[in-house]
Amino acid sequence: MKALDELTFDNRFARLGDAFSTHVLPEPLDNPRLVAASPGAMALLDLDPAVAETPVFAELFGGHKLWAEAEPRAMVYSGHQFGSYNPQLGDGRGLLLGEVYNQAGEHWDLHLKGAGQTPYSRMGDGRAVLRSSIREFLASEALHALGIPSSRALCVIGSDTPVWREKQERGAMVLRLAPSHVRFGHFEYFYYTKKPEQQKQLGEHVLALHFPECQELPEPYLAMFREIVERNAELIAKWQAYGFCHGVMNTDNMSILGITFDFGPFAFLDDFDAHFICNHSDDQGRYSFSNQVPIGQWNLSALAQALTPFISVEALRESLGLFLPLYQAHYLDLMRRRLGFTQAEDDDQKLVERLLQLMQNSGVDYSLFFRRLGEHAPEQALARLRDDFVDRNGFDAWAELYRERVARDPIQGQDLRRARMHAVNPLYILRNYLAQKAIDAAEAGDYSEVRRLHQVLSRPFEEQPGMDSYAERPPEWGKHLEISCSS
């Protein structure tokens, strides 16, 4: 394990030059202090978890100190926001400190969010508040633990720095890790500003670093785009299967690596609601839960437009046509596993759709239903779940189909069935009300609940003694909370 001063930097994005980013120093927080750190994320940098408790840790990730090898840069990009093109966005409050490579040879971007104003702050103060920083920290690590591709969060640093939003709050910083911070919007920026040389330079950079296997193929850019399509189809399939609503699927928030990026007003479903809108600024429901699949394809089409200098329109259209079949295959595979099936049958999609409609009509808790379905043998589990449904006759009809489907599946024994289902059906998810309780405590100076919640969410599939309250249905006030983009 390494100490903080032993990290090895290799700042490949910074070497692209000033057309891609601007050198900016972090603005330090007043009285920085550790709110929470992720040992799992620290391990990606070979860091000893004990260093999180040292004063220099808070000073580094609170903007007071920098490694000599770090090259803090604010990246420039553009993007489509709620369907409309915004010509220049960029890192308005975050800085790419540099890239660190670990003993396994993996490169990880170190990105400090809430680091102060940059040339791309667009009249903003460049700060992030404590509540949004805690949410990003918890969400990043929770999604990773669920097996959903995501950026990681090394730590949250709190402070006494005053920040004004709807009211005065305290500033904070999050240290985010990702193999790359290149977004769809990076390619859009150089396409729409008509900078073909820089766009080509960006493309070669991304190919060499993140899609090297595509370089050997006859059409490397086309191969790369198809890989991006596949990764995003799989990502969104996992969002839908686990009930995750991102909330702000603008193209500048979409990663070329197909990882969940830029957590804002996200939410996991409580009661199943296909039309749930977690972002209270989304008046039209563009980024509602049910729209995430078509919006994912729309965003890929926006990226495709930016790649027309490298790939024929016909080939791009053909590749975009792969998205929905790929999504459906990944989604159905996940849902079969959540229902306890080990083999595919033609009518599985209808069985899933019928179940979701029944859950929608009755307001059934999405995550708890699947967890409880695997607790007991099908007959007993279905009898216990029946009371959650208003349409008992409809549920009985579905339950009969489910029993018949289970009987045809080759899985043997309830113990094996329970183990397989519990391995894909979490007991603990990051419900918004749990995050809010942790935030309320943290804003009062008590960080223990943030740390406890993080520990619980790091093992979502395992029953943890004494943690029953984290697996309960939310209270009425905690259901379907809409979260502001204000952060």
Curated annotation (Swiss-Prot):
Organism: Pseudomonas fluorescens (strain ATCC BAA-477 / NRRL B-23932 / Pf-5)
Cofactor(s) this protein requires: Mg(2+); Mn(2+)
Binding site for ATP: 90, 92-93, 113, 125-126, 176, 183, 262
Function per UniProt: Nucleotidyltransferase involved in the post-translational modification of proteins. It can catalyze the addition of adenosine monophosphate (AMP) or uridine monophosphate (UMP) to a protein, resulting in modifications known as AMPylation and UMPylation.
Catalytic activity entry: L-seryl-[protein] + ATP = 3-O-(5'-adenylyl)-L-seryl-[protein] + diphosphate; L-threonyl-[protein] + ATP = 3-O-(5'-adenylyl)-L-threonyl-[protein] + diphosphate; L-tyrosyl-[protein] + ATP = O-(5'-adenylyl)-L-tyrosyl-[protein] + diphosphate; L-histidyl-[protein] + UTP = N(tele)-(5'-uridylyl)-L-histidyl-[protein] + diphosphate
Protein name: Protein nucleotidyltransferase YdiU
GO molecular function, one term: magnesium ion binding
Similarity annotation: Belongs to the SELO family.
Binding site for Mg(2+): 253, 262
Active-site residue list: 252 (proton acceptor)
Enzyme class per UniProt: transferase
Enzyme Commission (EC) number: 2.7.7.-, 2.7.7.108
HAMAP family assigned to the protein according to its UniProt record, in alphabetical order: YdiU_SelO
Bilayer-crossing regions: none
Source superkingdom: Bacteria
Listed NCBIfam families: PRK00029.1 (NF000658), PrtAdtaseSelOPseudom (NF045949)
Swiss-Prot/TrEMBL keywords: ATP-binding, Magnesium, Manganese, Metal-binding, Nucleotide-binding, Nucleotidyltransferase, Transferase
InterPro entries: SelO (IPR003846)
